[in-house]
């Protein structure tokens, strides 16, 4: 039947990944024939609705060479146990569509020519990008006259050079020394004689087309791994360009140094067109790399290629908010519009509009201070005089004031300098109006200054690079530094969201613009981190910025096509915004587009992983072949030689197996991801199109059929499809899907568990027990799979303990004890009666109040132990009572009120101290055997150390202190009787100290200028003075050490106390050296 073909393809795909998937397909193929008449919902749709894929169209546009290319095939008697080589190619044509087309692919085969016995491709001299040139809006119109109407030839500025080429090993000995230039559009490895070139649309698993018939026949039956840079042969040591091209082809997103070295290599050889080509290829992979755009623009500017330079500006300025890029643009505009010859004012107008455009896009950056300063200086250089009365003067004044007021509100490095310039500008025009403007702008300036300080503190270690790197795997090199950069960027984003500039209420648009700007800056460095793209899009959607949010998602998917997070978010947005679409087929096609792109990227990763596995295995085998074999001695036996050979072979096999196991883990994770992508698509199509109708609407069943055709899926897809059929439609097809999945995944414990749950949900207990016995028996037969049976046993044990027979429960527990002897029996028994949130077998009721008696609090955190401990060096003082009045002990009677411990009186005589020492020794001897179990009453105070007790016994009593004592009552009364003046003018001063403050005052031999007010000189030494200022502030002048001492005396005197109470004291210390 039709379903057999699909299942057969699935079996063959699963057999190639048996190591990572963990199932056996031997008896599944036989079961397929016996159950061919069973119903499967996907079998009714697979013929009418083939799996959609963009790459399927490539087979229609292949050249005759690729069409006639022999395809590798599998024999029908493949290993049924799943022991096939992990790197075998898929045997179905559907899997070929999963490989994405390289970015440099073209639809027309290039023309070839033969040079020196080598087949090479002609270079493409066309430059299609120049024809669509549009000048920037702010550039002068007069510049259009010098732009050529025809595209500039690709090699116009390229000097003749002799680049290196790539050769095979056979060609290294026989080929001529003549080199041929590489293509300027794509790096093509030259093939020698019987080596065919791989078609750009060809699947990665297809073998290369050969020119010799016998080699073509061999490639039809063998499964060679495709050539790769790591294993490609024939690169000459001095072929620097070819080696770098190989590195880029192998890892275009991860090997950034190879890109940079290749650009430098071309530029050092004066191959400008080749350098341009590498720049273009690099910027397709990293389109937000402002550093490389700046380098590209700088190269064109140095070559005086102004037309190409303007093209770069048109492509980047409005999409890449980078201060460096806008600086290059402003330099170009000022270069093209000289002010020295500007008689009409048109050049100044163009430059001014360019500055306005730049500040509109990057003026909020904390590194934009130089552009603000240049803009202000540009305005100052304009016609008119600041402070003049003409219309040009007034216009210039208004422009400067507006520019300053905009600049001082931005938290940037130059904000302090610009504020000082603005202060001088306003005060130089009119002090009265200047104070008014400064007072109005001061809050904004203070907020910007404090915000910049705070921002600079936590971004000090931030690396604002625009050359993104792939996230290192945890535990790999650079993972800590990468996580640190992510944390700093997130702190900056959250800081902007917190609205430190208080813009949300006054200017909501500016607040949103600042947050989006920081997101764009972060994404330049964290381009390959999907979480940041998701957060940026989500912020835009929550703030009514639908266009910006969709743009973030689109660019994020371009950067991370294998990200499930971004693809799912994009699909959700399309599903929500397309609710008005009445045609479910059109709506489903629109929603399915992100899923298809994600699946293509994931299948491509699986293909690359398998290719990498084959390369690693081939490299290991080549390494063992190149090892020199030790020559056995003449008296060695053949048995020793054979044992040594076997040992080497076992070592090689062990290393190869380790490599394959490592790759199988990665492929298994990728297969899991592919499966959940199919599940998400299946659920989305169910919401939009339902389960589908044959010949009308595909629905979720068609997605299930597509997933089975493309392969590389786990049991999760079968589980999800079956549960959708059951929960949404109550369709009997759910049981059929579970039955088919049980044959495909006989050792998958998760699938068996879900199958059991489904059978119990439909009340098919007999089949549930049968499935349980079959699964457990099969898993327990292999000791390595015994642990997989534990969740299955636990589930059925829980069901039987609630709804089954006690004999069944006991039998299950007996089998569980045999399989898991380390598990405690108590837990198995308690599992019968417990729930996830309560276990009655562990409940201990409170029977007596003594069970709830509070714990005894011991001083110092010491808790008495059950076993005796060595006695401390000093006995506890709580049992050391004064011989004068013994301390009463009511510990035995808990009902009587507790008394506070009375402080011990000092022991005056020597006899009393002797009695105390004898009492301590007696108590110490009695406490030794029972010191650990001694009971102390609750809440007793901590004992005093022996040294403190001794000190209290030797100090004199309080009656012997005859000196003067401080009286707090008299001090408070003195403060109450103070006559505080209402103002400064009411302070009585000596007539001799009054003056007009017009001269100088000598204090301690030093001269102080009189700036208004009165002086009061204190002390005979004349070393300090209290200056009463006209503005109501006390200023205390001091001179030298004596002046400082006298200032403190005066400060706490009557006048100083008055100044302290008024809180208006200023201490003025001119730091005059002491005389």
From Swiss-Prot:
Organism: Emericella nidulans (strain FGSC A4 / ATCC 38163 / CBS 112.46 / NRRL 194 / M139) (Aspergillus nidulans)
Alphabetical list of PANTHER family matching this protein: CLEAVAGE STIMULATION FACTOR SUBUNIT 3 (PTHR19980:SF0), RNA CLEAVAGE STIMULATION FACTOR (PTHR19980)
Basic and acidic residues bias locations: 885-896
Region (Disordered): 20-185, 215-237, 621-653, 840-941
Domain of life: Eukaryota
Cellular component aspect of the GO annotation: cytoplasm; nucleus
Biased composition regions of type Polar residues, renumbered to the chain: 54-72, 93-112, 868-883, 925-940
Listed name of the protein: mRNA 3'-end-processing protein rna14
Pfam families (alphabetical): Suf
Function: Component of the cleavage factor IA (CFIA) complex, which is involved in the endonucleolytic cleavage during polyadenylation-dependent pre-mRNA 3'-end formation.
Compartment annotation: Nucleus; Cytoplasm
InterPro entries assigned to the protein according to its UniProt record, in alphabetical order: HAT, Rna14-like, Suf, TPR-like_helical_dom_sf
GO molecular function: mRNA binding
Disulfides per UniProt: none
Entry keywords, A to Z: Cytoplasm, mRNA processing, Nucleus, Repeat
Biased composition (Acidic residues): 120-133
Taxon lineage: Eukaryota, Fungi, Dikarya, Ascomycota, Pezizomycotina
GO biological process terms, semicolon-separated: mRNA 3'-end processing; RNA 3'-end processing
Any coiled-coil regions, as ranges: none
Gene3D superfamilies reported in the protein's UniProt record: 1.25.40.1040
Residue spans of the HAT repeats: 270-302, 304-335, 346-381, 395-428, 465-498, 510-542
